[in-house]
Amino acid sequence: MHERDNNMIRISKTSKLDGILSWSLQALETCQGSVNPDGTLVPACSGCYATTGNYNYPNVKAPRLENKSDWKRDAWVSDMVQALDSSRYFRWFDSGDIYSVALAEKIFEVMQQTPWCKHWLPTRMAKFAKYQDVLARMQALDNVMVRFSSDSVSGEFDARHGSVIIENPEALPEGATLCEAYNNGGKCNGCLLYTSDAADE
């Protein structure tokens, strides 16, 4: 993972997604949807990849910590639009999640103002009523794919979910499509299924 600075915007290149750019926050502390009512982590977030390996290095953490305050700037939306000027695909949150409705509204503005860019936003925040309106408006945009992440690691999901974890690829639930990264050493290798509404993964 490599960090890039456009004006004051800190964005990353995600190695799994063939270098597609991403804007991220620190994992868990911005992931309200990762916690059960009793305070334990939901199964899908236990052992989160974004809390291990390279994500623990200070130079990787720093941009995510800066992003948590940087998005509140008045010029953040216009700076993000400029940063995405030559991007055709963009991932929101390779770590972290939408922890604020105000942040979600700003992300929606960026999506509106960058129709040339296909946005992918995986999130667990749809379980909270206050986020459902802005997420629905995001979904209504032609250039946006919001994927609601299931909390399960055993393939359980309901109609709203667009992403679910399974421990055994042979136990793929009916109606779901297996992410090809399973067969490509953890890499997308040009596959863009995650940006379409073709299937769950």
Placement of each model-derived feature along the sequence:
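Core AdoMet radical
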Residues: 51-77, 81-103, 111-129, 143-155
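Helix-rich interaction surfaces within compact, conserved domain-sized segments
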Residues: 164-169
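Extended repeat-based interaction scaffolds and adjacent low-complexity, acidic/S/T/P-biased segments
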Residues: 173-186
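Conserved small/polar residues in nucleotide/adenosyl-binding loops
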Residues: 194-200
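N-terminal [4Fe-4S]-dependent radical SAM core
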Residues: 1-69, 86
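Glycine-rich, charge-decorated loop segments at or immediately adjacent to ligand/cofactor-binding or catalytic sites
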Residues: 130-134
